[in-house]
Protein backbone atom coordinates (compact mmCIF):
# COMPACT_ATOMS: atom_id res chain seq x y z
CA UNK A 1 0.00 0.00 0.00
CA UNK A 2 3.01 2.33 0.17
CA UNK A 3 2.47 3.25 -3.48
CA UNK A 4 -1.20 4.04 -2.93
CA UNK A 5 -2.92 7.23 -1.97
CA UNK A 6 -4.55 7.02 1.48
CA UNK A 7 -7.69 4.89 1.43
CA UNK A 8 -8.09 4.76 -2.35
CA UNK A 9 -7.03 2.48 -5.18
CA UNK A 10 -5.03 4.97 -7.27
CA UNK A 11 -1.25 4.64 -7.28
CA UNK A 12 1.53 6.93 -8.45
CA UNK A 13 2.06 4.47 -11.29
CA UNK A 14 -1.61 4.83 -12.29
CA UNK A 15 -1.24 8.60 -12.52
CA UNK A 16 1.73 8.18 -14.83
CA UNK A 17 0.64 5.29 -17.04
CA UNK A 18 -3.11 4.60 -16.76
CA UNK A 19 -4.66 8.05 -16.31
CA UNK A 20 -1.93 10.47 -17.42
CA UNK A 21 -4.36 12.84 -19.16
CA UNK A 22 -6.90 13.10 -16.31
CA UNK A 23 -4.25 13.04 -13.59
CA UNK A 24 -3.85 15.74 -10.97
CA UNK A 25 -0.25 16.03 -12.15
CA UNK A 26 -1.64 18.19 -14.97
CA UNK A 27 -2.85 21.77 -14.67
CA UNK A 28 -6.44 22.01 -13.40
CA UNK A 29 -8.79 22.26 -16.36
CA UNK A 30 -11.50 24.87 -16.76
CA UNK A 31 -14.23 23.64 -19.09
CA UNK A 32 -15.75 26.62 -20.85
CA UNK A 33 -19.35 26.22 -22.03
CA UNK A 34 -20.03 29.80 -23.06
CA UNK A 35 -18.71 33.31 -22.46
CA UNK A 36 -20.36 33.42 -19.01
CA UNK A 37 -20.44 29.75 -18.01
CA UNK A 38 -17.58 27.41 -17.16
CA UNK A 39 -16.72 24.58 -14.79
CA UNK A 40 -13.57 24.44 -12.69
CA UNK A 41 -12.88 28.07 -11.88
CA UNK A 42 -14.61 30.70 -9.78
CA UNK A 43 -18.04 29.95 -11.27
CA UNK A 44 -20.41 27.25 -9.97
CA UNK A 45 -22.93 26.40 -12.71
CA UNK A 46 -26.25 24.84 -11.78
CA UNK A 47 -27.70 22.31 -14.20
CA UNK A 48 -31.43 22.09 -13.48
CA UNK A 49 -34.56 20.77 -15.12
CA UNK A 50 -35.95 17.39 -16.08
CA UNK A 51 -34.16 14.13 -16.61
CA UNK A 52 -37.11 13.28 -18.85
CA UNK A 53 -38.96 15.82 -20.97
CA UNK A 54 -42.68 15.15 -20.54
CA UNK A 55 -44.20 17.95 -22.58
CA UNK A 56 -43.66 21.52 -23.74
CA UNK A 57 -45.65 23.15 -20.92
CA UNK A 58 -43.64 21.56 -18.11
CA UNK A 59 -40.30 22.32 -19.74
CA UNK A 60 -41.29 25.93 -20.41
CA UNK A 61 -42.17 26.37 -16.73
CA UNK A 62 -38.76 24.99 -15.78
CA UNK A 63 -37.16 27.46 -18.19
CA UNK A 64 -39.11 30.34 -16.65
CA UNK A 65 -37.72 29.32 -13.26
CA UNK A 66 -34.21 29.18 -14.71
CA UNK A 67 -34.69 32.66 -16.19
CA UNK A 68 -36.00 33.99 -12.86
CA UNK A 69 -32.89 32.67 -11.11
CA UNK A 70 -30.46 33.84 -13.81
CA UNK A 71 -29.35 30.31 -14.69
CA UNK A 72 -28.44 28.98 -18.12
CA UNK A 73 -27.92 25.20 -18.08
CA UNK A 74 -31.16 23.29 -18.64
CA UNK A 75 -31.27 19.57 -18.12
CA UNK A 76 -33.61 18.13 -20.74
CA UNK A 77 -33.59 14.37 -21.21
CA UNK A 78 -35.14 13.15 -24.44
CA UNK A 79 -34.06 9.52 -24.08
CA UNK A 80 -34.56 7.89 -20.68
CA UNK A 81 -32.77 4.70 -19.54
CA UNK A 82 -35.29 3.33 -17.04
CA UNK A 83 -34.16 0.52 -14.73
CA UNK A 84 -37.07 -1.66 -15.88
CA UNK A 85 -38.66 -1.89 -19.36
CA UNK A 86 -42.20 -1.22 -18.07
CA UNK A 87 -43.62 2.31 -18.28
CA UNK A 88 -46.29 3.91 -16.15
CA UNK A 89 -49.52 4.80 -17.92
CA UNK A 90 -48.62 8.48 -17.44
CA UNK A 91 -45.32 8.22 -19.29
CA UNK A 92 -44.28 7.69 -22.84
CA UNK A 93 -40.91 8.52 -24.30
CA UNK A 94 -41.07 11.37 -26.79
CA UNK A 95 -38.07 10.02 -28.64
CA UNK A 96 -36.81 12.05 -31.57
CA UNK A 97 -40.02 14.13 -31.57
CA UNK A 98 -38.83 15.64 -28.29
CA UNK A 99 -36.24 17.71 -30.13
CA UNK A 100 -39.06 19.83 -31.54
CA UNK A 101 -39.76 20.95 -27.96
CA UNK A 102 -36.07 21.66 -27.42
CA UNK A 103 -36.03 23.73 -30.59
CA UNK A 104 -38.91 25.85 -29.24
CA UNK A 105 -37.17 26.18 -25.88
CA UNK A 106 -33.98 27.50 -27.47
CA UNK A 107 -35.97 30.03 -29.49
CA UNK A 108 -37.84 31.34 -26.45
CA UNK A 109 -35.24 31.15 -23.67
CA UNK A 110 -31.56 31.88 -23.27
CA UNK A 111 -30.59 28.40 -22.10
CA UNK A 112 -28.05 25.74 -23.01
CA UNK A 113 -29.10 22.10 -23.19
CA UNK A 114 -27.64 19.21 -21.19
CA UNK A 115 -29.03 15.88 -22.38
CA UNK A 116 -28.14 12.21 -22.04
CA UNK A 117 -27.04 10.16 -25.01
CA UNK A 118 -27.58 6.40 -24.94
CA UNK A 119 -26.48 5.23 -28.38
CA UNK A 120 -24.07 6.34 -31.09
CA UNK A 121 -26.80 6.59 -33.73
CA UNK A 122 -28.31 9.63 -31.95
CA UNK A 123 -25.20 11.81 -32.26
CA UNK A 124 -26.24 13.24 -35.63
CA UNK A 125 -29.57 14.59 -34.35
CA UNK A 126 -28.37 15.56 -30.86
CA UNK A 127 -25.47 17.59 -32.23
CA UNK A 128 -28.01 20.10 -33.53
CA UNK A 129 -29.41 20.87 -30.07
CA UNK A 130 -27.11 19.75 -27.26
CA UNK A 131 -24.51 22.00 -25.62
CA UNK A 132 -23.30 19.36 -23.15
CA UNK A 133 -23.59 15.62 -23.73
CA UNK A 134 -24.36 13.57 -20.64
CA UNK A 135 -22.93 10.06 -20.45
CA UNK A 136 -25.17 8.45 -17.84
CA UNK A 137 -24.05 6.18 -15.02
CA UNK A 138 -25.15 3.05 -16.88
CA UNK A 139 -22.93 3.96 -19.84
CA UNK A 140 -19.91 5.10 -17.86
CA UNK A 141 -17.89 2.17 -19.22
CA UNK A 142 -19.43 2.13 -22.68
CA UNK A 143 -16.11 3.05 -24.20
CA UNK A 144 -17.18 3.03 -27.89
CA UNK A 145 -19.96 5.51 -27.06
CA UNK A 146 -17.60 7.72 -25.04
CA UNK A 147 -15.07 7.79 -27.88
CA UNK A 148 -17.70 8.68 -30.49
CA UNK A 149 -19.19 11.46 -28.37
CA UNK A 150 -15.74 12.81 -27.53
CA UNK A 151 -15.02 13.18 -31.23
CA UNK A 152 -17.81 15.77 -31.50
CA UNK A 153 -15.54 18.02 -29.40
CA UNK A 154 -18.55 19.12 -27.36
CA UNK A 155 -18.38 19.13 -23.54
CA UNK A 156 -19.17 15.83 -21.83
CA UNK A 157 -20.70 15.35 -18.38
CA UNK A 158 -19.46 11.89 -17.38
CA UNK A 159 -21.46 10.34 -14.55
CA UNK A 160 -19.87 7.87 -12.18
CA UNK A 161 -21.59 4.47 -12.13
CA UNK A 162 -23.02 3.60 -8.71
CA UNK A 163 -20.72 0.57 -8.47
CA UNK A 164 -17.57 2.16 -9.89
CA UNK A 165 -14.46 3.32 -8.11
CA UNK A 166 -12.85 6.69 -8.67
CA UNK A 167 -10.13 4.84 -10.57
CA UNK A 168 -12.78 3.39 -12.91
CA UNK A 169 -14.31 6.82 -13.49
CA UNK A 170 -10.99 8.40 -14.38
CA UNK A 171 -10.24 5.47 -16.68
CA UNK A 172 -13.44 6.26 -18.59
CA UNK A 173 -12.55 9.95 -18.75
CA UNK A 174 -9.19 8.97 -20.20
CA UNK A 175 -10.93 7.46 -23.25
CA UNK A 176 -12.52 10.84 -24.00
CA UNK A 177 -9.38 12.86 -23.32
CA UNK A 178 -7.43 10.59 -25.66
CA UNK A 179 -9.65 11.90 -28.48
CA UNK A 180 -8.21 15.38 -27.81
CA UNK A 181 -11.45 16.52 -26.21
CA UNK A 182 -10.48 18.24 -22.97
CA UNK A 183 -14.01 19.40 -22.16
CA UNK A 184 -14.70 16.59 -19.70
CA UNK A 185 -16.70 17.18 -16.51
CA UNK A 186 -16.96 14.41 -13.91
CA UNK A 187 -20.18 13.82 -11.98
CA UNK A 188 -20.78 12.11 -8.63
CA UNK A 189 -24.37 10.83 -8.39
CA UNK A 190 -24.34 8.31 -5.56
CA UNK A 191 -23.00 4.81 -4.94
CA UNK A 192 -24.72 1.58 -3.98
CA UNK A 193 -23.70 -0.15 -0.75
CA UNK A 194 -25.43 -3.10 0.97
CA UNK A 195 -25.29 -1.48 4.39
CA UNK A 196 -26.90 1.84 3.45
CA UNK A 197 -30.38 2.82 4.58
CA UNK A 198 -32.17 1.31 1.59
CA UNK A 199 -35.59 1.98 3.06
CA UNK A 200 -35.02 5.72 3.01
CA UNK A 201 -32.44 6.32 0.30
CA UNK A 202 -31.73 4.94 -3.15
CA UNK A 203 -27.97 5.50 -3.12
CA UNK A 204 -25.34 6.92 -0.81
CA UNK A 205 -24.08 10.32 -1.98
CA UNK A 206 -20.30 9.94 -1.88
CA UNK A 207 -19.30 13.46 -0.84
CA UNK A 208 -15.80 12.21 -0.09
CA UNK A 209 -15.41 11.55 -3.82
CA UNK A 210 -15.35 15.30 -4.51
CA UNK A 211 -12.15 16.23 -2.61
CA UNK A 212 -10.69 12.86 -3.63
CA UNK A 213 -11.24 13.61 -7.32
CA UNK A 214 -9.78 17.07 -6.85
CA UNK A 215 -6.69 15.44 -5.35
CA UNK A 216 -6.22 12.79 -8.04
CA UNK A 217 -7.58 14.52 -11.15
CA UNK A 218 -7.32 17.77 -13.07
CA UNK A 219 -10.98 17.64 -14.16
CA UNK A 220 -13.91 19.62 -12.67
CA UNK A 221 -16.46 17.74 -10.56
CA UNK A 222 -20.25 18.17 -10.53
CA UNK A 223 -22.53 16.60 -7.90
CA UNK A 224 -26.07 15.32 -8.54
CA UNK A 225 -27.74 14.97 -5.11
CA UNK A 226 -31.23 14.44 -6.59
CA UNK A 227 -30.46 11.03 -8.08
CA UNK A 228 -28.38 9.94 -5.12
CA UNK A 229 -30.86 10.41 -2.29
CA UNK A 230 -34.06 10.01 -4.37
CA UNK A 231 -36.06 12.00 -1.76
CA UNK A 232 -36.91 15.63 -2.54
CA UNK A 233 -36.91 16.69 1.12
CA UNK A 234 -33.21 15.82 1.45
CA UNK A 235 -32.02 17.40 -1.80
CA UNK A 236 -31.70 20.86 -0.25
CA UNK A 237 -29.24 19.92 2.50
CA UNK A 238 -27.24 17.55 0.31
CA UNK A 239 -26.87 20.25 -2.33
CA UNK A 240 -25.52 22.69 0.26
CA UNK A 241 -23.13 19.99 1.50
CA UNK A 242 -21.96 19.31 -2.06
CA UNK A 243 -21.03 22.95 -2.50
CA UNK A 244 -19.23 22.96 0.86
CA UNK A 245 -16.99 19.99 -0.04
CA UNK A 246 -15.84 21.62 -3.27
CA UNK A 247 -18.24 20.78 -6.10
CA UNK A 248 -17.52 22.73 -9.28
CA UNK A 249 -21.16 22.47 -10.32
CA UNK A 250 -24.51 21.10 -9.19
CA UNK A 251 -27.26 19.12 -10.91
CA UNK A 252 -30.77 19.50 -9.50
CA UNK A 253 -34.02 17.88 -10.54
CA UNK A 254 -37.01 20.24 -10.51
CA UNK A 255 -40.63 20.13 -11.67
CA UNK A 256 -43.63 22.51 -11.45
CA UNK A 257 -45.72 19.69 -9.93
CA UNK A 258 -43.26 17.03 -8.72
CA UNK A 259 -45.68 14.58 -7.16
CA UNK A 260 -47.46 14.23 -10.49
CA UNK A 261 -44.30 13.88 -12.55
CA UNK A 262 -44.44 10.95 -14.96
CA UNK A 263 -40.89 9.88 -14.01
CA UNK A 264 -39.09 10.04 -10.64
CA UNK A 265 -41.83 11.97 -8.78
CA UNK A 266 -40.13 11.55 -5.40
CA UNK A 267 -36.81 13.25 -6.10
CA UNK A 268 -37.73 16.49 -7.88
CA UNK A 269 -38.19 19.71 -5.91
CA UNK A 270 -40.84 22.24 -6.88
CA UNK A 271 -40.04 25.61 -8.42
CA UNK A 272 -40.43 27.60 -5.19
CA UNK A 273 -38.12 25.18 -3.36
CA UNK A 274 -35.67 25.49 -6.23
CA UNK A 275 -35.56 29.29 -5.95
CA UNK A 276 -35.06 29.08 -2.18
CA UNK A 277 -32.20 26.62 -2.69
CA UNK A 278 -30.51 28.78 -5.34
CA UNK A 279 -30.71 31.82 -3.04
CA UNK A 280 -29.02 29.89 -0.23
CA UNK A 281 -26.37 28.57 -2.60
CA UNK A 282 -25.56 32.14 -3.65
CA UNK A 283 -25.04 33.15 -0.01
CA UNK A 284 -22.72 30.21 0.68
CA UNK A 285 -20.84 30.60 -2.59
CA UNK A 286 -19.92 34.18 -1.68
CA UNK A 287 -18.11 32.95 1.43
CA UNK A 288 -16.14 30.60 -0.84
CA UNK A 289 -15.35 33.41 -3.30
CA UNK A 290 -17.41 31.61 -5.93
CA UNK A 291 -20.35 32.71 -8.08
CA UNK A 292 -23.47 30.66 -8.86
CA UNK A 293 -24.38 30.81 -12.55
Positions of PLM-derived features:
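Acidic (Asp/Glu)-rich catalytic clusters
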Residues: 39, 63-70, 103-108, 127-128, ...
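Catalytic alpha/beta core domains of metabolic enzymes, predominantly
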Residues: 39, 152-257
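Glycine-rich, proline-tolerant flexible connector loops at the mouths of alpha/beta enzymes
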Residues: 75-97, 255-266
Amino acid sequence: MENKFPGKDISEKDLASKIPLSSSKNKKKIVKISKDTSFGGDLIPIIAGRNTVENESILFKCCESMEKNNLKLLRAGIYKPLTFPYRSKNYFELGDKGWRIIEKVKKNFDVMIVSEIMEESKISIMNNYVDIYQIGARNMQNYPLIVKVAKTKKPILLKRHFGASIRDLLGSAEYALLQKNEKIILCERGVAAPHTHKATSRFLLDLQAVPALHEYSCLPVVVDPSHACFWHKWVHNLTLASLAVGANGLMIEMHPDPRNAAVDPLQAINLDEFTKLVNQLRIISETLNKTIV
